[in-house]
Amino acid sequence: MNLSCIIVDDEPLAIRLLENFIERTPFLKASFTDSVAAMQSITNDSADVLFLDIQMPDMNGMELSHMVPSHTRIIFTTAFKEYAFDSYEVNALDFLLKPIRYNKFLAAAEKAKKWFEMALQPQNNQHTTVFLKVD
């Protein structure tokens, strides 16, 4: 299973680092760094994982997170740990504190992969029982 990714960040160095991490992770593919392309991809519901910075000039990541389709999992990437609590209020899958190390990135990516694998499994483990009383 390959997961498509979008990077939304205003820092070129952070973008390059995340692109490098995505390239090193076999089950992740495709990244958009242009904010217009990213927004189009987000609204077209074509991204599985969104690596989203929080503090950005025009629209912050928290505001943008409310525009993300429910199918897309958000992993926040920020240098400000005080946003950690807020990130889980918008149902983020994970929160990576900058500077991001590859092992932390990989753990978050594995969490996303596991989430999608579980979401795609058929729900056959539910048993339905019907009792009828007939006179």
Tell what function each PLM region has.
Residues 13, 36-121:
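CheY-like receiver
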Residues 11-30:
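Two-component/phosphorelay signaling modules centered on CheY-like receiver
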Residues 6, 30, 75:
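Conserved beta-strand positions in the Rossmann-like core of class I SAM-dependent methyltransferases
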Residues 1-4:
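Non-catalytic signal-transmission and effector/linker regions of two-component phosphorelay proteins
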Residues 32-33, 55, 129-133:
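Short gly/ser/thr-rich secondary-structure transition/capping motifs
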Residues 114-135:
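Conserved binding/recognition cores within well-folded domains
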Residues 9, 33-36:
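Short beta-to-alpha connector loops in regulatory alpha/beta signaling domains
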Residues 8, 28, 95:
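Short, flexible active-site loop motifs that bind/organize anionic cofactors or intermediates
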